[in-house]
Amino acid sequence: MLKAVLKKSREGGKGGKKEAGSDFGPETSPVLHLDHSADSPVSSLPTAEDTYRVSLAKGVSMSLPSSPLLPRQSHLVQSRVNKKSPGPVRKPKYVESPRVPGDAVIMPFREVAKPTEPDEHEAKADNEPSCSPAAQELLTRLGFLLGEGIPSATHITIEDKNETMCTALSQGISPCSTLTSSTASPSTDSPCSTLNSCVSKTAANKSPCETISSPSSTLESKDSGIIATITSSSENDDRSGSSLEWNKDGNLRLGVQKGVLHDRRADNCSPVAEEETTGSAESTLPKAESSAGDGPVPYSQGSSSLIMPRPNSVAATSSTKLEDLSYLDGQRNAPLRTSIRLPWHNTAGGRAQEVKARFAPYKPQDILLKPLLFEVPSITTDSVFVGRDWLFHQIEENLRNTELAENRGAVVVGNVGFGKTAIISKLVALSCHGSRMRQIASNSPGSSPKTSDPTQDLHFTPLLSPSSSTSASSTAKTPLGSISAENQRPREDAVKYLASKVVAYHYCQADNTYTCLVPEFVHSIAALLCRSHQLAAYRDLLIKEPQLQSMLSLRSCVQDPVAAFKRGVLEPLTNLRNEQKIPEEEYIILIDGLNEAEFHKPDYGDTLSSFITKIISKFPAWLKLIVTVRANFQEIISALPFVKLSLDDFPDNKDIHSDLHAYVQHRVHSSQDILSNISLNGKADATLIGKVSSHLVLRSLGSYLYLKLTLDLFQRGHLVIKSASYKVVPVSLSELYLLQCNMKFMTQSAFERALPILNVALASLHPMTDEQIFQAINAGHIQGEQGWEDFQQRMDALSCFLIKRRDKTRMFCHPSFREWLVWRADGENTAFLCEPRNGHALLAFMFSRQEGKLNRQQTMELGHHILKAHIFKGLSKKTGISSSHLQALWIGYSTEGLSAALASLRNLYTPNVKVSRLLILGGANVNYRTEVLNNAPILCVQSHLGHEEVVTLLLEFGACLDGTSENGMTALCYAAAAGHMKLVCLLTKKGVRVDHLDKKGQCALVHSALRGHGDILQYLLTCEWSPGPPQPGTLRKSHALQQALTAAASMGHSSVVQCLLGMEKEHEVEVNGTDTLWGETALTAAAGRGKLEVCELLLGHGAAVSRTNRRGVPPLFCAARQGHWQIVRLLLERGCDVNLSDKQGRTPLMVAACEGHLSTVEFLLSKGAALSSLDKEGLSALSWACLKGHRAVVQYLVEEGAAIDQTDKNGRTPLDLAAFYGDAETVLYLVEKGAVIEHVDHSGMRPLDRAIGCRNTSVVVALLRKGAKLGNAAWAMATSKPDILIILLQKLMEEGNVMYKKGKMKEAAQRYQYALRKFPREGFGEDMRPFNELRVSLYLNLSRCRRKTNDFGMAEEFASKALELKPKSYEAFYARARAKRNSRQFVAALADLQEAVKLCPTNQEVKRLLARVEEECKQLQRSQQQKQQGPLPAPLNDSENEEDTPTPGLSDHFHSEETEEEETSPQEESVSPTPRSQPSSSVPSSYIRNLQEGLQSKGRPVSPQSRAGIGKSLREPVAQPGLLLQPSKQAQIVKTSQHLGSGQSAVRNGSMKVQISSQNPPPSPMPGRIAATPAGSRTQHLEGTGTFTTRAGCGHFGDRLGPSQNVRLQCGENGPAHPLPSKTKTTERLLSHSSVAVDAAPPNQGGLATCSDVRHPASLTSSGSSGSPSSSIKMSSSTSSLTSSSSFSDGFKVQGPDTRIKDKVVTHVQSGTAEHRPRNTPFMGIMDKTARFQQQSNPPSRSWHCPAPEGLLTNTSSAAGLQSANTEKPSLMQVGGYNNQAKTCSVSTLSASVHNGAQVKELEESKCQIPVHSQENRITKTVSHLYQESISKQQPHISNEAHRSHLTAAKPKRSFIESNV
């Protein structure tokens, strides 16, 4: 018969795995008939194929009803343990993560990940291999479960988790616990599974609900311990938040099978539809859609689903990694039937309802802790809470009384039904957790008729006075106030005050095991604390420090709940409070029903009350507890330092009396039905009501529950008072329940039909759904099963007793009713007593008949129910077989995972001894390896935890004594280390090897010594050790003793050391001996660990202070290295030498300095330690401190006189070593104290080079600031280090900016060009962006310099290059326009300005210049017409007043002009700063900021750049060589001053606008302000060579050069220039072009760079003058002479080329009016103006091609057509006719210097100072031979000067827009 029962549908089950249809069919098999079950009519389930059937067909395992949705974690479910093991605190190593089956776990997550996209928050390095989000989520969960840290950014938001879980589960994985064991996934029934039960086969194998203790188990039953290990509840679904499936349109998907309602409970967590199915769900059962694409399959339950796995039931469940957080999901958000619908209650912590297969992108890490979701069934929509104000007031006073020793909390004590739960619920409802409380309709037996929609929201209104209700009833219904407003106010204040302090709460419910377990309590409280708005800082901390979340993971809570609560909750909260991140107020945690938790007391471990007693002393004083407990359980809280408040002293306490009266009055007055039923004649007056009220209150004895149920009977008309004796009124709760049952079950047979249901509900460890109960009932039938409709009728009859909760599970209406069904007091009527044993039997049969394997949890639960059912009682005599063997056969036939269940996490840490014995009898392997303590065998784990009874059981069944974990430790080692003396004795008596060594070479004796267990050590010495020579893996006793001495000394166990030193001769140890394990003496070990007491003890026993350890280190060095100065003092007092040196020549001072122990250093110096001692490497104490970066020690040693320039054997100073380490502050300190910054060691390295080599960015910046020079080694070391390289380049630019600011244009240009040469060509990828920005800045700065030296062609070219990099830069267009205007290319300038205006229409400066240029274009046309008629003076602009008066000196003119320009346009002059937007992470923004700070004060911005190729050069070639003529100073002044007036104001206003309005990047420091350009633009440029053609055929070159080269230089670029978005590249190009160009400009280009400052009106007629061959102006068109027309700097406008090439010096000056403004600053740094104007005039056809010398950035004067060294096109090079290429740098230097007239002072003075008499006709004759001669003479001088100008920096102040237009 047993076999028939067990094997029924076994075949079907197995087949079911393969064939979807072979589920339970109508076929019947013999079934055991249990007591009452036989009466139930039998009906077989139809075979309709629907989702229901599918789920069964797939072999879904069924477990006890936990939540209907209880997803069952097949194999994955872990059992949780309730209690902390008694063993010593485990080290982290013991908490190692169990192994996870790879494929099972990872594959599903891979799938899940596909649809997800990482959130933008998860910024990943592009090159980093990135794992899929799913994989990350998996890792995160693994981290939690395993107790490890969580990978950052892998957290899934609670909402998304839900959906992710769905998918993951369908793959067969428990979303919450990737750790669990073998089979991957919880079944759909598992709380962590959001799928239908039909989803996965593996899931079916194990049901999460394995429980052992029945809810009805009494406290003395040890089996109940198993319950403690249970972790799942009907709330699981709630917890997982995914109990419901939603269709696309948002409707619930419900599947029905044969009338069975499959609608799973809606997500209680869903914000909206939580309560959805209250009424309508049943009527509307839309067909469940299960399209794959739609997401998780709709949940459909078949009969099998009735047996859903209840998540964690008995202790041993998951293979787990216990972390089946999912099953917790449900739980944690398990409904609080108390109408408390907390905010997170919507869908498990806020999960999104729609579980379509959409995956939201992963969000940044979130809290993965989930609170249990509580639901108190007896709280109904009509419950009211009246009174109790006195109680709240009293609690408040007591908690606020700081003098009270018992103010750590309050205990509310009361009998059953006295309103304890209502009080807690009221506080929760008004707290931060009750803002979205939802009233849950309940059908409690006495609840008064409902007049409102049961699902309506009823909020606790803070305005109401708290109304009291029965213990289970507290709702928001507003009581009609029976208390006056005055009295109400202060009372309300008390309840509000307390509620405002509530940060967490917990309800213990006996019929929901999880709520009674310590691990769940810890985890849930932590989760609620995170959600409390007062503790937002705690939440932030958990997000920031994932290891804290890991510490609070369920797995950690099971293994050591005390440590988890202390380290994960109390310590972080205390620290936050100390840091003032938590408001300085008091906070409260509420716990209801501690007595209920006692019902599930485990064999080992704490109950909730003992746990609180153990941990309360660790609570901070500001965190209080308010707990409730039943009066007959007061002893469990007797040790708590709490104030006790009783609700029991009914007759004496007037407040209680008034509360009860107020409640009755309220109910009577609010219901006409009650009024009419309590009055004899239908008319009730106040007297009558008062009498009835007094009678009821008297009968109640203080019980609100009694009053509520009695008044409900009056309200429904079941009771009517017919006489004044009130005999009809029941006198007790027991009578009330009897009356209700009699009304419900008119006959005994009616009750017997319902009895099996009650039995199952009583036996179950968790609330069960109707489907689960249905499965259990039918499991007891062999033939004809009960029909669903019949079953539903019975359930309807019981609906007032078994309240349906939000998750569709059923819970007893009140704990007292549950107890009444099981137990009656003597003399009470025994009608309606139930037999939970039969319920256990039905549940056991349900598990036995379940298809597929049971998981660990289900197996434990099955064992629990088998033991509780005890169906073989009395059969042993008949059969001859003991009942225990029959039970073992039963469980053996029913499941295969006995060993895994035995070793499940909960069963290890809170073992259920009886169920474990049953599992072992059934065949479980007692040597099975666990997932903890390095995969130790079960015996090792239990020995470590000190579970003596379990160890005895394992040894009884033959567990291997010498089985080891992976680290080689045996059970004896674990027991000795943990200090379990009884187990050590037990194991040694059984014959375990005492001398066994683990993999670290330690035996049990050493383990006991390390942890200070002297008694065990002495006991082990008395045991028998292996005789003879030690075998491999064993140890001699003498060696073990020496090791034990070292071990005890190192850990400071002085008692053990004393014991060992006092051993008799047989066991004598050598006090100076070195052990064979660590090689330490006892003294070196103690000194190194800072154990002062032990050191003194050892020295007292004759330990030698000079005795070294195996490595030759004496005790003094051990102590100094670890900073234990007290021990150093002790050793010095015992005769040690303070300057003792070791083998390397190091002294204790060096060792202490090296380790950074300042106090020890100070102590040693005070004792005479030599500061100047050097070790064998030549390093001093200061050197060591610098090398290790200990700044405080460095400062102290320097102050004490340490030599700061001491070099070691390699020539390194402390500064070198500090630069190597990388502490910038130490480096700065040493430099300030006089360290030589340019010191070179023996290998040729300087401190800067070392810092660069080690990539110590902050040190590099610090040294550069202090003036470190950049040598070849520095650049070599910076190669391939973009972050360092950009710092060096910025340093060069900074130096150039300083030069520019000082007016040294030549030196500035050299710096800029040198920087350009150092730019990396490629290879940095993203890191190139900051380089490109910097390059743009340099180009703009160079363009600025060129215009300052009147080299307009080059200026134009540089601006063009900036434009290539940043095509949308209006500043670049503006700059190029200025250059073109200066070279009189008005049309091209006009085009550029128009572009600039388009890009920045609001810039006034640009508009002003545009208007001026338009006017000048008109003037030019007029002047050309006049020129045809004859040489006439050029018409004057209104803004340009030119005079004919000759000006005596050039230098004055320039001086004044320059000054004026600087004054008027400081912004314009500021050198373009480095781009501020630094996209590349490699360049520290702080550095750029620092550099810019230095650059931002002085200097002028550079003019904007324009596009190349806009204007053709207007200049014509000069036919004949001649002397270089310079216009007079006045003539030049005239030109400058013409537009100063209008320009100045514009500069000031415009400059700021430019910066603001520039849409591209921020300004760059120095001559050219550059707006950031899009990355990516590139241009090719050759930095080393340039071809200069000086031929007339190159007119178009000017167009190409565009902006910066007004001089018609032809800069043939070897490659086409491609403007790209990248700022830096272009800059680089521009700079390199310019740099080379400047340096290489050949003499033959001496295009008449006359004082091109003179601004000419449109037509400049030369008033032919003495012997000048032609008096008409020649527009040098960038051809042979490349004359840079009379335009010099940005400050003045160039109307056209002013320079004329004449054969003779022109002596007369054209007259014209001009304003002369004095100039005080040297122009381009050159006071002698002649240099600026010397024009180079070489044979027109020669072209020079010279590599520009690095660093020689010369400024071309008078725009003498410099040609960019980067030839743009070879064809252009040919134009000149000659391809003479300069061969050497000297030539380039020469040409550059010549080119920059500013450099050749001699030339300037001797050959070029030729005054120009007529401004209009200022004609300079360039004499080529003189020029060549001067060039050759000046070459060396120039190159030297160039090098000198290398280092200097300037600070830019304003944007580069030029104002003197």
Swiss-Prot record:
Taxonomic lineage of the native organism: Eukaryota, Metazoa, Chordata, Craniata, Vertebrata
Reported modifications of this chain: Phosphorylated; by MINK1 and TNIK upon stimulation by RAP2A.
Subcellular localization, as worded in the UniProt entry: Postsynaptic density
Functional description taken from the UniProt entry: May be a scaffold component in the postsynaptic density.
TPR repeat ranges per the UniProt record: 1289-1322, 1336-1369, 1371-1403
Segments annotated as ANK repeats: 896-928, 934-963, 967-996, 1000-1029, 1040-1069, 1078-1107, 1111-1140, 1144-1173, 1177-1206, 1210-1239, 1243-1272
Quaternary organization: Interacts probably directly with DLG1, DLG4, HOMER1. Interacts with DLGAP1, INA, CAMK2A, GRIN2B and GRIA1. Interacts with TNIK. Interacts with MINK1.
Protein name: Protein TANC1
Keywords: Acetylation, ANK repeat, Phosphoprotein, Repeat, Synapse, TPR repeat
Bias type Low complexity, positions: 461-480, 1421-1431, 1467-1485, 1659-1689
Start and end residues of each stretch annotated as Disordered: 1-46, 63-99, 206-225, 257-311, 439-486, 1421-1485, 1636-1696
Composition skew (Basic and acidic residues), residue ranges: 8-21
Family as reported in the entry's similarity comment: Belongs to the TANC family.
Protein's UniProt keywords contain Calcium: no
Modification sites for N-acetylmethionine: M1
GO CC terms, sorted: axon terminus; dendrite; glutamatergic synapse; neuronal cell body; postsynaptic density
InterPro entries recorded: Ankyrin_rpt, Ankyrin_rpt-contain_sf, Dendritic_Spine_Reg/Scaffold, TPR-like_helical_dom_sf, TPR_rpt
Chief location: other
Post-translational modification Phosphoserine, affected residues: S63, S66, S67, S207, S270, S465, S1439, S1668, S1676, S1677
